[in-house]
Amino acid sequence: MAQRIFTLILLLCSTSAFAGLFDAPGRSQFVPADRAFVFDFQQNQHDLTLSWQVKEGYYLYRKQISITPTKADIAAVQLPAGVWHEDEFYGKSEIYRKRLNVPVTVNQAAAGATLTITYQGCADAGFCYPPETKTVPLSEVAAAIDATPTPAVTQTGETSKPAAQLPFSALWALLIGIGIAFTPCVLPMYPLISGIVLGGRQRLSTGRALLLAFIYVQGMALTYTALGLVVAAAGLQFQAALQHPYVLIGLAIVFTLLALSMFGLFTLQLPSSLQTRLTLMSNRQQGGSPGGVFVMGAIAGLICSPCTTAPLSAILLYIAQSGNMWLGGGTLYLYALGMGLPLMLVTVFGNRLLPKSGPWMAHVKTAFGFVILALPVFLLERIIGEAWGLRLWSLLGVAFFGWAFITSLQARRAWMRIVQIILLAAALISVRPLQDWAFGSPSAQAPAHLNFTAISTVDELNQALAQAKGKPVMLDFYADWCVACKEFEKYTFSDPRVQQVLGDTVLLQANVTANNAQDVALLKHLQVLGLPTILFFDAQGQEQPQARVTGFMDAATFSAHLHDRQP
């Protein structure tokens, strides 16, 4: 019996030792993408369900999920709302955990039809997988009678992105409308318009006067709302074209010209003949009657003064970018309501509530020119990138606050000195990105990052290993979509301790952001599951599996790891 027990213990120990052979330090703690995100699908005629089972401790990015049909037509795909995840480099992103089901309506599918599904995810421990692509074969489905054709490519993760990224909400239109009311082309006209609305009657009850003014404003709002709906509908039809770089540049130029008109460089307004005709039509209406006042307001909405043309055009272009019908109509309605509020006050309370006319009205008009200039910066930022976008915002901020400071110097009141100090401080803060760009930022004084040699194929890797001349080699895999890769660059590779240990090491880096065929081949050849992954080769060009790094390491941990791998 004792011999049997001894034999059993020896067997258990040998089993543990055998398992330990496969638990080497270089073994990745992360599972392959197919096990982290188990994908499946099920089709029942027109109804297709895509599903992912997400492993605990992993997540999928909502914006990285895309569906592309081939020889098939599908309805617009709506992804369910995810949970918010935030990191230092990419900010807030919607993600999915545990399980994701996406219903897809197949309007029509021919023989051999497929869906190409692309998705990408990461692990909470700081390990990201390259984009995964799956091909789903579709059963033949006859087109339904009420099926509506959809574009060939549906990028579901970005469905609402253009509208969501617009620079201001519709409520800003209300404030813009109120501001436009105090420009030199509009404010002096309110007493005259008030008299026309009341029909020349001076003794009307407050309620009656308020009602007539409100009806006039609603007539004006009707015209603007209709314009907003038409432009939003047109923008919806050409939404994809409106995101093309050439179109964005063209819109930015138009916005810049509109802003210059607010600065007084030239005048924008309807042809005088058309304005005269509309004015005559308005004069034929009977003031003091609800119907006549409503028509007056509707016609007034079509008569654009030099002060209102540029802001109105800017808002219309903003709406076209959104392609949102509700946003389009609501924005223009609030804009008209903002312009009409001072008129309602004048109609009820008289001229005593209006501020006195003066040069300040021209300053209001100029200020709106700077507001319009923010729109081309917003559009160009999509093309030129975040760094140059920040510099444009900086330039705009310096220009606006500098102009406001110089303008405020004309004031004589003591409290304006506080305003001047605030404006000057804002201008100095705004100039910082331009200063960093021109003279170098303080971060430039930080220790230099590692100097990598780029490789992209297996052949280039073998050639670099052959040219290492007996030196050890480190190969770092990097991608723009890998958060932990950026953390390695910022916190680990910049550390003097790490740089000192790697002083005699040949440094290679493979950028696999594109995830193209040669990237996939390199990853597969080296059995790399995801990023960040760092490989080490000895002086003979052989990989040291036990030294392989998967996942983020801070400078101290990575430095210790480098010391441990050294012979």
UniProtKB/Swiss-Prot annotation:
| Lineage, uppermost ranks | Bacteria, Pseudomonadati, Pseudomonadota, Gammaproteobacteria, Enterobacterales
Where exactly are the transmembrane stretches of this chain?
170-192, 212-234, 246-268, 297-319, 326-348, 358-380, 387-409
Protein name in UniProt: Thiol:disulfide interchange protein DsbD
Gene3D superfamilies xrefs = Glutaredoxin (3.40.30.10), Thiol:disulfide interchange protein DsbD, N-terminal domain (2.60.40.1250)
The top EC class, named as a word, is oxidoreductase
Q: Which PROSITE patterns match?
A: THIOREDOXIN_1, THIOREDOXIN_2
- State the gene name recorded for this protein: dsbD
Q: What does this protein do?
A: Required to facilitate the formation of correct disulfide bonds in some periplasmic proteins and for the assembly of the periplasmic c-type cytochromes. Acts by transferring electrons from cytoplasmic thioredoxin to the periplasm. This transfer involves a cascade of disulfide bond formation and reduction steps.
* Superkingdom of the organism of origin: Bacteria
